[in-house]
Curated annotation (Swiss-Prot):
Keywords: Electron transport, Membrane, Mitochondrion, Mitochondrion inner membrane, NAD, Respiratory chain, Translocase, Transmembrane, Transmembrane helix, Transport, Ubiquinone. Core subunit of the mitochondrial membrane respiratory chain NADH dehydrogenase (Complex I) that is believed to belong to the minimal assembly required for catalysis. Complex I functions in the transfer of electrons from NADH to the respiratory chain. The immediate electron acceptor for the enzyme is believed to be ubiquinone. It comes from the Eukaryota. Its EC number is 7.1.1.2. One of its GO terms (biological process) is aerobic respiration. This is NADH-ubiquinone oxidoreductase chain 1. It is found in: Mitochondrion inner membrane.
C-alpha cells in the first residue's frame, strides 16, 4: 500500500476516532445531567430503559429520528434545513486542534487557540439563520438574544485568552499545556478561571444564562419551529460545545493531560485519562450550576458581561503583563 492510500485511510480513521467518542459522550452527558439534577431534586431520574437507565439516550435518539420533520409553510426551506447542520458541524470541526495527550491531536496548529476562538464566533451564524429562516417572531427574538449574548461574552473570553497567551507566548495548545508543568495557570489566575467558566456558560447558552431559549417567554427560543433531526442537531451541537468549552478550560487552566501531582504513580496513568477526568469535572460544574441557580434577567446578563467582566478581564491583561515585564518573566 503506497503512502497516498495510507493517508486516505488514516485521515478518516482519525476523524472518526474523534467524532464517535464525542457523540457517545454527548449521549451519556444528557443522561448524566438528568441523573445529577434528579439527585439534587431528591428524585430517581431515568431508570426504566435498561439497567439504571443506561439505554435512555438510545431511546431518546430513536424517538427524535423517527419523528416527522415538519417545516413552517412560510419558512425559507434551504436555510431552515442548513442552520442545524452548520451549527452541529462547527461544534465538531473545533475538535481538530484539541490535544488529548502529548502528540494525540488531529492537527497541532501554531494558531490553535485563535482557530478555536474563530470557530466559536462562527457558531452564532447558525443560530441567527435558524431564527430568521423560521419566519417566526419567537424564533427570531430568541436568535437575536443569542447573538447579542454570544458577542457580548466573546469580548471577555478573547481578553482572557490574551492573558493566558501573554504567560506562554504561543497560541499552540500543546505548548500552553507544557508551560503548566511547574504550576497550573488556574492557581495564580484563579479569578480569571472563574470569569472564563462563567463566560463559557453564557457562550454556550447554558443555565443560568439560557435566555435565548427561555421557555416561559420565548417558547424554547430560536429552535421552536424545529422537530425531528433538526432539533436533535441543535441539541447535539449545544452539548458538544459544552464538552469543547470544558476541554478548553482544562487546557488553559488545569494543565490539560498533565497529572494532578508530579508523582511516579500518577505518571503511570495515561494523559488522555487525566484530560477526561478534568473535563468531566467541568461538565459536572455545568450541570450543578443549572440545578442550583435561577435564570438571570436579560438586562442583568448584559450588565454582567459589559460592566463587570469586560473591565475585570481588561484589568487582568494589564496587571499580568505588568508583573511579567517587572520581574522579567516574559516567555
Amino acid at each position: 500500500m503506497n503512502r497516498k492510500s495510507k493517508m486516505y485511510i488514516a485521515v478518516p480513521a482519525e476523524i472518526l476516532g474523534i467524532i464517535l467518542p464525542l457523540l457517545l459522550g454527548v449521549a451519556f452527558l444528557v443522561l448524566a445531567e438528568r441523573k445529577v439534577m434528579a439527585f439534587v431534586q431528591r428524585r430517581k431520574g431515568p431508570d426504566v430503559v435498561g439497567s439504571f437507565g443506561l439505554l435512555q439516550p438510545l431511546a431518546d435518539g430513536l424517538k427524535l429520528i423517527l419523528k416527522e420533520p415538519i417545516s413552517p409553510s412560510s419558512a425559507n426551506f434551504s436555510l431552515f434545513r442548513m442552520a442545524p447542520v452548520a451549527t452541529f458541524m462547527l461544534s465538531l470541526v473545533a475538535w481538530a486542534v484539541v490535544p488529548f495527550d502529548y502528540g494525540m491531536v488531529l492537527s497541532d496548529l501554531n494558531i490553535g487557540l485563535l482557530y478555536l476562538f474563530a470557530i466559536s464566533s462562527l457558531g452564532v451564524y447558525g443560530i441567527i439563520i435558524a431564527g430568521w429562516s423560521s419566519n417566526s417572531k419567537y424564533a427570531f427574538l430568541g436568535a437575536l438574544r443569542s447573538a447579542a449574548q454570544m458577542v457580548s461574552y466573546e469580548v471577555s473570553i478573547g481578553l482572557i485568552l490574551i492573558t493566558v497567551l501573554i504567560c506562554v507566548g504561543s497560541c499552540n495548545l500543546s505548548e500552553i499545556v507544557m508551560a503548566q508543568k511547574q504550576i497550573w495557570f488556574g492557581i495564580p489566575l484563579f479569578p480569571v478561571l472563574v470569569m472564563f467558566f462563567i463566560s463559557c456558560l453564557a457562550e454556550t447558552n447554558r443555565a443560568p444564562f439560557d435566555l435565548p431559549e427561555a421557555e416561559a417567554e420565548l417558547v424554547a427560543g430560536y429552535n421552536v419551529e424545529y422537530s425531528s433531526m433538526g432539533f436533535a442537531l441543535f441539541f447535539l451541537g449545544e452539548y458538544a460545545n459544552m464538552i469543547l468549552m470544558s476541554g478548553l478550560c482544562t487546557l488553559l487552566f488545569l494543565g490539560g493531560w498533565l497529572p494532578i501531582l508530579d508523582l511516579p504513580i500518577f505518571k503511570k496513568i495515561p494523559g488522555s485519562i487525566w484530560f477526561s477526568i478534568k473535563v468531566i469535572f467541568f461538565l459536572f460544574l455545568y450541570i450543578w450550576v443549572r440545578a442550583a441557580f435561577p435564570r438571570y434577567r436579560y438586562d442583568q446578563l448584559m450588565g454582567l458581561g459589559w460592566k463587570v467582566f469586560l473591565p475585570l478581564s481588561l484589568a487582568w491583561v494589564v496587571s499580568v503583563s505588568g508583573v511579567l515585564v517587572t520581574f522579567q518573566w516574559l516567555p
